Amino acid sequence: MLFKKDRKQETAYFSDSNGQQKNRIQLTNKHADVKKQLKMVRLGDAELYVLEQLQPLIQENIVNIVDAFYKNLDHESSLMDIINDHSSVDRLKQTLKRHIQEMFAGVIDDEFIEKRNRIASIHLRIGLLPKWYMGAFQELLLSMIDIYEASITNQQELLKAIKATTKILNLEQQLVLEAFQSEYNQTRDEQEEKKNLLHQKIQETSGSIANLFSETSRSVQELVDKSEGISQASKAGTVTSSTVEEKSIGGKKELEVQQKQMNKIDTSLVQIEKEMVKLDEIAQQIEKIFGIVTGIAEQTNLLSLNASIESARAGEHGKGFAVVANEVRKLSEDTKKTVSTVSELVNNTNTQINIVSKHIKDVNELVSESKEKMTQINRLFDEIVHSMKISKEQSGKIDVDLQAFLGGLQEVSRAVSHVAASVDSLVILTEE
């Protein structure tokens, strides 16, 4: 026991005075319920007077009361954690001292009630549970009873002190617990309102999400359909690339055949050009021969003329020789005519040779140009074939990628459908 009993004094502890007739309950109408609570616990002016008479005794032992109160809190570590998180033991001891002294002031007014409401609000805010609050208040009551037993020898007055103290502590607990409940109800109402708002938001959002997923599902399905179309087009493109590649290879082979033919023509033209050069040389030699023959004919004609002259001089004896000379002259003239005709033909032949040579040169140039163009076309076909191979490979890769993409889209479509079904279920739940 914290307090020693003093049995020496047997006189009355509470003096009779008009103080107990004082109007000690000074509450306005806003605390009408508190007035009813006071009546229920039988806490009136007489009891408040007793408390006022006990105040010096409480003040004398206030340190021991407060120390015992906080020592008792060691039984629950969470209480000390709350104290250390929001204040300190020393500060709270001073606060508790003032609070206890106010309980024994002998007056209950609006300020008294408001302070208790504020205390309850603080307790709720820092997370103090009602069970720990009530347990701690029981320690206060027991400490005060020990003080009374040690100081008040008159059993009736001791009982009066215990009753008054029990009633004021009971009122304290009622006020704090009511404030607890009020704060709790307010918090619960706020949470309920938030829950309703959240419920409404979830319902609205769920509906929006449901619509969104429905649209997404349609979009994904459209994308799947389009992807399938692209896949078919890609396959068709691969087939087309293969066909173009085959035709390009065939065209390249035909071009190579034509190029070989052009090479043969070019070789033949070169040979013809060489033969034409030889023919021109032969024609030039023939012209030289014609010159010689013409000279011989002219010499023969001159000899024939000389023979005719000599025959005329010879008279009758030279007639036979004149006939021969005349025939030789005719033969010479015929030879000259023939040579002239043949020379003209040779000249015409030379002209034709020159024309043909020019044509051959032109053809040769055309053949060279054609060969060059065929070479370029051949390179172009090589590039086309190479490009078609790359295109076919890329088309095949694209088709593989499209198939994988299509598979992924189908997975997404199934996932979207599953989520959409879940959202629909959520919408139904929120509507309930």
From Swiss-Prot:
<dbReference type="GO" id="GO:0046872">
    <property type="term" value="F:metal ion binding"/>
</dbReference>
<dbReference type="InterPro" id="IPR009050">
    <property type="entry name" value="Globin-like_sf"/>
</dbReference>
<dbReference type="GO" id="GO:0006935">
    <property type="term" value="P:chemotaxis"/>
</dbReference>
<comment type="subunit">
    <text>Homotetramer.</text>
</comment>
<dbReference type="GO" id="GO:0009454">
    <property type="term" value="P:aerotaxis"/>
</dbReference>
<keyword id="KW-0408">Iron</keyword>
<dbReference type="GO" id="GO:0007165">
    <property type="term" value="P:signal transduction"/>
</dbReference>
<dbReference type="GO" id="GO:0019825">
    <property type="term" value="F:oxygen binding"/>
</dbReference>
<dbReference type="InterPro" id="IPR004089">
    <property type="entry name" value="MCPsignal_dom"/>
</dbReference>
<dbReference type="GO" id="GO:0016020">
    <property type="term" value="C:membrane"/>
</dbReference>
<keyword id="KW-0807">Transducer</keyword>
<dbReference type="Pfam" id="PF11563">
    <property type="entry name" value="Protoglobin"/>
</dbReference>
<dbReference type="InterPro" id="IPR012292">
    <property type="entry name" value="Globin/Proto"/>
</dbReference>
<dbReference type="InterPro" id="IPR044398">
    <property type="entry name" value="Globin-sensor_dom"/>
</dbReference>
<comment type="function">
    <text>Heme-containing signal transducer responsible for aerotaxis, the migratory response toward or away from oxygen.</text>
</comment>
<dbReference type="InterPro" id="IPR039379">
    <property type="entry name" value="Protoglobin_sensor_dom"/>
</dbReference>
<dbReference type="Pfam" id="PF00015">
    <property type="entry name" value="MCPsignal"/>
</dbReference>
<keyword id="KW-0349">Heme</keyword>
<comment type="similarity">
    <text>Belongs to the methyl-accepting chemotaxis (MCP) protein family.</text>
</comment>
<protein>
    <recommendedName>
        <fullName>Heme-based aerotactic transducer HemAT</fullName>
    </recommendedName>
</protein>
<keyword id="KW-0479">Metal-binding</keyword>
<feature type="domain" description="Methyl-accepting transducer">
    <location>
        <begin position="184"/>
        <end position="420"/>
    </location>
</feature>
<dbReference type="GO" id="GO:0020037">
    <property type="term" value="F:heme binding"/>
</dbReference>
